[in-house]
Amino acid sequence: MAERKIRIRLKAYEYRTIDASAAKIVETAKRTGAQVVGPIPLPTERTIYTILRSPHKHKDSREQFEMRTHKRLIDLVNPTDKTVDSLRKLDLPAGVAIEIKL
């Protein structure tokens, strides 16, 4: 029998919220009887924006802003129907983007 696998990718700007969400997902999956691989930390994506401080001139005076996107990967091996139902009902913070592949 081929093993079923659900791959969950999490993205967030704050690492605390993504770690808390990953812990909730792992705890729910283990409680319902699925094997869990992860959470695996993926490379953090850094986006840097450079802007002029002055609206018209002084090109030498610039300011840089940075946006970091933290990512985690969780694999659920052989999930039961109960696992899928519990993950659907799970309440996660608003700042976490979830991508699920079956």
Swiss-Prot record:
It comes from the Bacteria. Keywords: Ribonucleoprotein, Ribosomal protein. One of its GO terms (biological process) is translation. Transmembrane segments: none annotated. PROSITE patterns: RIBOSOMAL_S10. It holds the Pfam family Ribosomal_S10. One of its GO terms (molecular function) is tRNA binding. The keyword Disulfide bond does not apply. GO terms for cellular component: ribonucleoprotein complex; ribosome. Disulfide bonds: none annotated. InterPro entries: Ribosomal_uS10, Ribosomal_uS10_CS, Ribosomal_uS10_dom, Ribosomal_uS10_dom_sf. Belongs to the universal ribosomal protein uS10 family. Involved in the binding of tRNA to the ribosomes. Part of the 30S ribosomal subunit. This is Small ribosomal subunit protein uS10.
